[in-house]
Amino acid sequence: MKSIFNLSKGILSVALISVAFASCSEDTMDNINKDKDHTTSVPAKFILADVITATAFSNIGGDFNTYYSTYVEHMVGVDNQLANAEKRNGEPSASSTFNNVWGNLYSTLKNARIAINISSNEVTGNYTTKGIGEVLAAINAGLIADSFGDTPFSQAALPELANGQPQFLTPELDKQEAIYTAIMEYLDAAITDLPKGDKSDEIGEYDFIYKGDGEAWLKLAYGLKARYTMRLLARSSSKDADLQKILEYVDKSYTSIEEQAAFSIYSATNLNPLFDFQWSRDGLAASKSYADKLIERNDPRLRRIFCIGQGKLTENENAVSIQVTGADDPRFLMADNGTAESVKYEYNTPIFVYS
């Protein structure tokens, strides 16, 4: 009997030890694939460097530029998907047309909101950095509202997660009007925060537009206030008062082109996305309807804003520098809106793509 009891004790001990080892092994396995070198939090200035780049390169400089320029007849699409867009052949209504920029906008807005939250710590007091985040949030929210109308906003691109997942997997649509209200709130907050400065960890060189100059960002904020007040004039209950506000905002904004919010870090190897697209594909041609308006009004810009197509140049000419001299120029060749042939390097090129 005693031997049976001892045997039972032995079996129980082995079982307990096995369970303990299994538990330890499970804990070890749970932690073995955790990347301990991957940071879980970063200063807001690093996040805003990405937000500024994404806003300029992907959101403002991306698909909106190319597609919208054909829809409003500033340019004519003559190649591939832009030729389809020009002829309204699937591209305007296809759900995939703006997939890339849609994802980029919401990702950028979320990152701007994260930077705002990080900078809101009263101990660190990074008010200028917070104000920059608020201006960038307003810009991206404006692109969303202008482009998509009623769309997810208050329940989308939120900085806080719920159990590692977005708080709202099927966010509700916000009215476009509500998004414009939020834009103004962001700008008002920025106007309050920007002049206060940063107590620590200034954004400095990570601000690729103004190098952390709060006064410059303040002028941008007032310029955006003027823009969106103008955009809402048709719905204004007091147009005269809003027109006066616009003048006041403009007075507090830029006084020269040198102050504009320019993302000027492009180079021969890091190309402006619109220029890169045109240079590699020649998918956009000069618009006949646009040129006709300039001719009708005897607008002198006709001699400044169109370049000769690359296929029409001589060996000694440079595509970027040879401008059309007017409607009587023998190489004046505009693309017909909606019916242009899908050919490259023939039509005149709008100078805007070389900016």
Language-model regions, residue ranges each:
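Sec-dependent bacterial lipoprotein signal peptides
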Residues: 1-22
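Membrane-proximal, proline-rich intrinsically disordered regions
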Residues: 24-81, 92, 96, 103-106, ...
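Conserved, well-structured interaction surfaces
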Residues: 45, 80-151, 165-197, 342-354
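Short coil/linker segments at helix-helix boundaries
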Residues: 147-185, 201-210, 235-249
